[in-house]
Amino acid sequence: QRGGKGNALGRIIFRFDNNFSVFLHDTNSKGVFGQEDRGVSHGCIRIEKPYDFAVFLLADKNEKLKEKIYYSMTADSLANKKLVVNNVKVNPQVPLFITYYTLYPLAGGRIAEYSDVYGFDAVIFDMLRKYL
């Protein structure tokens, strides 16, 4: 799929080492962030403010690079190729930890419950069944 505003992955992708072909990315469906149930991805993680996230990741805060990234994210397919950034290596690397909870403890002994969009609860329950 070609880059551009119609691309399902949006205008920018943040790749990181993992064994699951998962990455963080922009989206062309911004309305999903206003929904209560946002588990609409196919495994990757959509970012609501990808440009702000890119700026956060830049250790040196190089203004020219930020301008090029912004241009790359907003330009159409006829863009000035000299101003488009294709890859930026984040240095130093930023650790990324992804957790998946369907139940989460809240203050006061309450529990927040979330949809099990990946179906992991049944797998875990089957593994723990003999101990219950």
Which positions does each model-derived feature cover?
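Well-ordered beta-sheet/strand-loop patches within structured domains
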Residues: Q1-L132
